[in-house]
Amino acid sequence: MNTNPKSTLPPRADFARNLIAKASAPAKQMRSVAPPARGFTMKVSRILLAVAAVASCAFRAQAQQTTLRVGHFPNITHAQALVASQLSREGKGWFEQRLGPDVKIEWFVYNAGPSAMEAIAANSIDLAYVGPNPALNLYVKAEGEEVRIVSGAALGGAALVVQGDGRLSKPADFKGRAIATPQLGGTQDVAARAWLKKQGYRITQLSGEVMVLPTPNPDQLSLFIDNKLDGVWTVEPWVSRLEMEGKGKIFLEQKDVITTVLVASVKALGARRELVKKFVAAHLELTEWINKNPDEAKRMANAALKVITKKAMPPELIDHAWPRLTFTTELPKGGLEAAVAEAQSVGFLRGKIDLSRLVTSP
């Protein structure tokens, strides 16, 4: 998976430049010799012209091609990205077919939202599938100048999973316990802190009466299995893995909250708005296709996860996780406002937040 794309000169263009440079270099002082036969000279000239023509075509093709860089996570909550990236690998690119032959899609994988939003701000990617809270954080931090939500993607699929031995059976049991989340400031991190605060616990970003530990999803699973975590607030497929591999049980499930949105950078919207518009339309079609073809969508999502994580998920695990999600491009009324309120309650956002520019239709 790409992490730092850069343009490279087409091999044919390199060859042409070297050949033309050699042909154009000043001749060395030599003894007088008979000139080459006219036929030989014409043959070399034809070769040079042909190579130059090939190089010119390569340069034009490269100059005309537009690349859209799209970020996502290795989570089932990002099923549209998993399915589309797998179709790209299989030579059946969903977005490529709908955006045209002059558009290339490059996929980039992140562990959680804050990292993806750093990439948006750095102009390293153009669009991303991400949770609402990291998008909100960047929107507020940049005073609305960096990111826009252009579509919904998924609801649900997030939960608090606790050890199955009964140590956490009610909110009062959480004092002094350790709960992991995917990344500081991410959607599940904010949800965990906000919920714990509502239960009366003192929670800070670095300490508190309950330890909230930002930890990458793969590490969460191994630490949970080793009994070094009391609970994990995360998303599918990790919720199901914690249940099935870690023998955990769901304490609290978020069934209807916004889990994933599709965002675009303000820079991409300014420079290539029509292309972003086509991408969003294709995303809508893909969401509908996933809902109509769940078995094929699950197969492709699992194939993509195998490429990214180097390990395929058991089909029964995917089957267990899938029904917990609703794939939709709609944003439920009040969903973003609720996310803002949670982030404000735990200090990630402060003051009055103007959301009037956050959501846009390209």
Which residues fall in each region the model found?
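N-terminal hydrophobic or amphipathic helices and topogenic motifs
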Residues: 39, 43-51, 59-109, 337-362
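Secondary-structure end/capping motifs
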Residues: 272-350
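Pocket-lining segment of extracytoplasmic ligand-binding domains
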Residues: 142, 166, 201, 206-209, ...
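Short, glycine-/small- and polar/acidic-enriched structural segments
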Residues: 64-214, 230-236, 253-256
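Short, low-complexity disordered leader/linker segments with a strong preference
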Residues: 1-67
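Stable alpha-helical elements in mature extracytoplasmic
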Residues: 77, 91, 116, 131-134, ...
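Short, surface-exposed acidic
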Residues: 101-105, 203-209, 306-319, 350-357
